[in-house]
């Protein structure tokens, strides 16, 4: 494992444990037995580290979701929604980082660098056969629901309900005409 990979993996661990808001480069490098100079040989700054961590977490996240390419786009999207809702309760700090941290938000504009988001966009595009609603508008509606619902679950306002998620997805897809 390279030094850069060690830094990224330790960053993921610290984010999962303490949240990204509390990440200190000094603490990170100390735990790895590195100097801050060694850190800066691999990353320009904390923002660049966060961008690489977002990409790495995104890859891991999509690889961990039990998707079967034989399933329909709708079935795959429902599996992703369930996985997000489960993950936000098990790893709330990682999920906050992956979805709401500024480096992650910057990468949203380039889905090619964000494998998880790219997969979601492809599935939504496959579901959108309407000429009146753009793929982007449908994506925003579905993605907003999934993220909002996951936050309600994280904050213990509700519990995951697969029927509600499927019904809402069906309604969003019907409303596209």
Where are these regions (language model features)?
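Amphipathic alpha-helical segments used for helix-helix packing
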Residues: 85-107, 151-159
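An amphipathic alpha-helix adjacent to DNA-recognition modules
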Residues: 4-12, 21-22, 33, 41-66, ...
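Hydrophobic alpha-helical connector segments
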Residues: 52, 66-90, 139-142
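Append "Primarily bacterial transcriptional regulators
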Residues: 27-30, 39
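N-terminal intrinsically disordered/low-complexity leader segments
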Residues: 1-2, 177
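Amphipathic alpha-helical packing segments from all-alpha helical-bundle domains
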Residues: 105-132, 136-140, 167-173
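Amphipathic C-terminal alpha-helical segment
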Residues: 90, 143-161, 173-177
């Amino acid at each position: 494992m390279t030094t850069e990979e060690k830094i990224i993996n330790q960053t993921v661990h610290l984010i999962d444990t303490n949240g990204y808001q509390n990440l200190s480069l000094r603490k990170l490098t100390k735990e790895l037995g590195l100097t801050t100079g060694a850190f800066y040989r691999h990353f320009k700054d904390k923002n660049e580290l966060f961008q690489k961590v977002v990409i790495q977490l995104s890859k891991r996240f999509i690889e961990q979701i039990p998707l079967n390419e034989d399933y329909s786009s709708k079935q795959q999207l429902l599996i992703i929604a369930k996985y997000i809702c489960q993950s936000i309760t098990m790893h709330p700090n990682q999920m906050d980082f992956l979805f709401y941290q500024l480096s992650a938000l910057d990468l949203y504009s380039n889905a090619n660098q964000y494998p998880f988001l790219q997969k979601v966009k492809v599935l939504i595009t496959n579901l959108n056969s309407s000429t009146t609603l753009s793929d982007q508008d449908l994506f925003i509606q579905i993605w907003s629901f999934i993220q909002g619902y996951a936050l309600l679950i994280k904050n213990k306002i509700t519990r995951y309900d697969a029927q509600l998620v499927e019904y809402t997805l069906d309604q969003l897809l019907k409303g596209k005409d």
